[in-house]
Amino acid sequence: SNNNIIESPFYQRKEVVDRYNGLILNCGKEFELEFRAYDEGMAYRFISKYEGTYKIINEQADFRFDRDYRSHLAYAPRGGADGNDRFNSSFEEMYTETSLSGIAENQLIMTPTLIVGNEGKKLCIAESDVISYPGMFLTRTEDYSNVLSGTYASYPEKMAPRSWNDSFYKMENYADYIAKCDGVRTFPWRILCIADNDIELLSNDMVYRLASPSRIADTAWIKPGLATWDYWNNWEGQGESGKT
């Protein structure tokens, strides 16, 4: 069990209560599977114990539902195309409401994705602590109408300059794996946030709590003020700023 306070001076509240029950399953010499159960949901992640270099061919994350629930989701703008270009997105799409069976087959869905269950209870599929690893999209296949499966872009092997309005670099060649790793590490959290109503979703801190702690030891120099498109101006994918 864990019951700590996370200092969060730059979050929507000054402190966040981090209370959960945890379990780590030892799956042999090379990896572990960690679970955490919160009052507001649950999460799991893989932990690698392998000390050499290795590649992640794929990750299977299936979210299976017992019936055809309603969902609120956003399709990736190129999500119906073939190949890895379909993952190229500015993440600015509108959400739509549909049943699970009404989701377009093999169309990429962005996360977070919201499922409306019995008595209006909400279940939100999300992720956290995505470092040097592709973000998770979701897809529904024809054979499994009530199942949403994690889908990931392949690792980019070659990039070339491209116009500013899409990306500074275009991926020209992709590998047959999704990530390259070196040594012991943790992988992204797969999260299920649970709420009785929409209001509770707004105060759910699971994504924040499951993220890695700040790497900046001294934050006293950070002052309130205005910033201009820091996410845009640092996106060229080169150097340390493009590590993720």
Give the ranges of each region predicted by the language model.
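N-terminal accessory beta-strand-rich subdomains and adjacent acidic, glycine-rich linkers
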Residues: 1-203
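An acidic-aromatic substrate-binding cleft motif
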Residues: 165-167, 175-244
